[in-house]
Amino acid sequence: MPGYETRFLLDASAPRPEASTPTAASSAGADALDAYSRTVIDAVRAAAPAVVHLRVLGKGPDGTVGPRGSGSGVIFTPDGFVLTNSHVVNGATSITATLSDGRSVVAWPVGEDPDTDLAVLRLHDSVPGWAPLGSSAALQVGQLVVAIGNPLGFEATVTA
């Protein structure tokens, strides 16, 4: 056909695009992404010792006690108070916390609020680490946050 030319992708005679050099904008973007990654890594290193995996036993519909589920929690005081979700521990007959150092200890319910889906547990044992609670008043809508959990026993799962 007049005006058309067929070339193959590996045609050695085809002109090659010039290699692009990184621009200041792409370099700045890469630097910002790397800085963000380092910030997330630092946050995980600091908080991961405070994250626990919770295994919950409870009564089933037939009245027998068995596994009801699992979840994550965070130790928020040096004396072993744990914050978790109410739906994780509601109706539990027994709660076991696996700590970041591998120990499994009994977690005792202190209180829960199903309306806010929050619960507090207590570990009567030494803890490998704790993460103090911050203030939500210090946050702004759209601000980036890091969530660290231990779903199904997968250690230090991160959402950032």
Predicted region positions:
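Short loop/turn microsegments at loop-to-beta-strand junctions
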Residues: S70-S72
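Conserved active-site neighborhood of the chymotrypsin/trypsin-like protease fold
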Residues: L57-G66, T77-T157
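A broadly tuned "polar low-complexity/structure-edge" signature
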Residues: P2, R7-L10, S100, A107, ...
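N-terminal activation segment of mature serine protease catalytic domains
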Residues: M1-T64, T93-S94, Q140-L144
